[in-house]
Amino acid sequence: TAQQKITVEEIYRGEFRTKGMDALQSMKNTNQYTVLNSDRTTRSQQIDLYDFATLKKVSTLLDTKSHTDLADGIDSYTFSNDEKQILIANNSNPIFRHSFTANYYLYSLNSKNLTKVLENVQEPTFSPDGTKIAFAKENNLFVYDIASKNTAQITTDGKKNAIINGITDWVYEEEFAFVRAFDWSADSKKLAFIRFDESEVPEFSMSIF
């Protein structure tokens, strides 16, 4: 029998790549889940909604083809508690094993509007009522109000290699695999956070080969 020829284009399009699934996020209705898919042909990504029972796609919640601000792609995404808003990370820059900074966009599933809200920040977290986003930047904590678009600084004493507010130090991240050291109260009115004081820890240089 004649052998089918394989083209370079087919290889780079991923025609022969094994099929798989990235991490899924279950929706609160327990009947559906979302997956971040990629389309190599159009160089775009989609947040798609699927049905657990049939495993078939129900709809596309967001397609980067429709949003030039996301041309660099989606690194991760998080839903608000009511699942009416999505916080999207892109242009992530690693710090240590788990920690990173990224730019964040807020997408409204009702209005279909995409807005850049945060730049070079860590661990943005929706308040339970979905009206605010707490985040860390340069060792300090902040709260962004979605309606007013105003940002309030919560701590001011953050300093590299000295004071860390709301983010774990390297040891906690490496040994316990968690980065965010703050959380909202149930009524969305308060933040609890850990403050690390490393000001007495001596510094030294080490060559890496």
Task: Name each model-derived stretch.
Residues 2-209:
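Beta-propeller folds
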